[in-house]
Amino acid sequence: MSYVDEVYERVVNQNPGEAEFHQAVKEVLDSLKLVIDANEEKYRKMALLERLVEPERIISFRVPWVDDKGQVQVNKAYRVQFNSAIGPYKGGLRFHPTVNQSILKFLGFEQVFKNSLTGLPIGGGKGGSNFDPKGKSDREVMAFCQSFMTELSKYIGADTDAVSYTH
């Protein structure tokens, strides 16, 4: 079995149920296969692919916030800090009911490559929550976002993580 195939198999085994992440890793590894195979011993010794496919850190946290009826709601949130080899983690936030760790790992993994092409000293990451802004009042969205950032601020800093928001 080739080094690329071994690493992909390990990703699948160590990250069960994360189909989105598996697919992103497979596509990247497949595109690198010829280059990696030609220099397999060198890359294997450096554990290049293992370092490429494993996030540096995944932060999982809860976000309590109060809706317009005075009810406390709690959402699940994540920040995947994938790779800081060339600079602070950079990647947006996604708020959607389908957000889960697999989706954010997939997006953070791809963000590493996207950011590396800018020529700027920034790494890759992604964050988000299963919060659904659809049908929420402006006050509810603001309450959620303020709580999200309060909780996230415990784990990030100016030299560590550069968060951007897109919707």
Residue ranges of predicted features:
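Ordered core of a single globular domain
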Residues: P16-L29
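Generic start-of-chain signal for non-secretory N-termini
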Residues: M1-A19
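ATP-dependent carboxylate/acyl-activation modules
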Residues: F82-G92, T98-G125, M142, Q146, ...
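Short beta-strand elements
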Residues: F61-D67, Q73-F82
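Structured beta-strand/loop patches that form or line metal/cofactor-binding pockets in enzymes
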Residues: E41-K69
